[in-house]
Amino acid sequence: MMTDPLSRSHAAALDAADPLRALRDAFVFPQHGGQDQTYFVGNSLGLQPRQARAMVSEVLDQWGALAVEGHFTGPTQWLTYHQLVRDGLARVVGAQPDEVVAMNTLTVNLHLMMASFYRPSAERAAILIEAGAFPSDRHAVESQLRLHGLDPDTHLIEVEPDAADGTLSMDAIAATIAQHGPRLALVLWPGIQYRTGQAFALGEIARLARAQGAAVGFDLAHAVGNIPLSLHDDGVDFAVWCHYKYLNAGPGAVGGCFVHARHAHSNLPRMAGWWGHEQPTRFRMEPQFVPSPGAEGWQLSNPPVLALAPLRASLELFDQAGMPALRAKSEQLTGHLEQLIHTRVPQVLQIVTPADPAQRGCQLSLRVAGGRTQGRALFEYLQSVGVLGDWREPDVIRIAPVPLYNRFCDLHQLVEHVETWAAA
């Protein structure tokens, strides 16, 4: 007799056969009623890798034993500590090692990148973003325009959603880039839209922007560690991201930055700091700034070693699993959840995120029948029973099954609780 592919027993069989199942044990889960919480919020804050504590302790022990000499001696000297995460990050984002650096935080890095790559002229001064962009991106863009004496009402162009669910078609993006091409100095685009969960064809967007003579940058906050990326091959000028979501580096973690290799030895103007000076002569303390080649030349201050340690722990797990395997499981998990919703609670939940797996990561953005009031009620009920998603105003519950630690059975637990709530 065939097993129902949407049954609990089939989900348990999928979990038992999952080649990545052991990775779940590498994370610390919050507890609810003495059991692991069912956690779907890796798109907001990833779980703590168990090895993170040991790697942070290693830094603390080295600090205690060596003090300032820890910069130059010890098992992991701090002078080059940031380079311990470089190769792993390059693999995750599809870059060469010298194109990436872990530094600062996302919006700080965005400002640094715009200082170099947003170079407005009288004819070409506009910045293009998506309507409904994450507020920090919009604040950064508007402030950069004002720093150049430009009016955001005139020089900030937004691509409006052209679908009823709030998503954006590639046709709309391409048409807007073509319409405003001669005016565009910069196209700044997300890898995944934070509210809808829509993923974009980044290579195509980069090609369209560069064909119009605009610089192109990506905010990969919701894409890095979630979907396959190929920043070098896509030809993007720069990208920025955070590490506290899918990269599991902890609250307020150090950010990440990509600068394409074609800019490695350029004389681009930049906001400079001493840690961006070339390493061989940095400690001569000479007044002339000589940038390190590649992305490291945009560093300002010495790296936050304690904050980098959890990122090391997480990247080891990414290397252990590999992005292709993680993506394959992610598509299975999110597709399974989509089927469960359509089959068992279609009258309760509407999926906002595109159905095409190529246009989404692991996140499904959900609206609840009855609007915001009912949505909040369901969200709070799920919290009360130990199932954690997150809420985004005005009316979206985001659920992100993360392949590193979520199971197929978790999806059934979620949907069963939705059924219980709806029947009450």
Curated annotation (Swiss-Prot):
Transcription regulation listed as a keyword: no
A single GO molecular function term of this UniProt record: kynureninase activity
Biological processes annotated in GO: anthranilate metabolic process; L-kynurenine catabolic process; L-tryptophan catabolic process to kynurenine; NAD biosynthetic process; quinolinate biosynthetic process
Catalysed reactions, semicolon-separated: L-kynurenine + H2O = anthranilate + L-alanine + H(+); 3-hydroxy-L-kynurenine + H2O = 3-hydroxyanthranilate + L-alanine + H(+)
Domain of life assignment: Bacteria
Keyword Nucleotide-binding: no
HAMAP family named among the record's database cross-references: Kynureninase
Protein function: Catalyzes the cleavage of L-kynurenine (L-Kyn) and L-3-hydroxykynurenine (L-3OHKyn) into anthranilic acid (AA) and 3-hydroxyanthranilic acid (3-OHAA), respectively.
Family: Belongs to the kynureninase family.
Name of this chain's protein: Kynureninase
Gene from which this protein is expressed: kynU
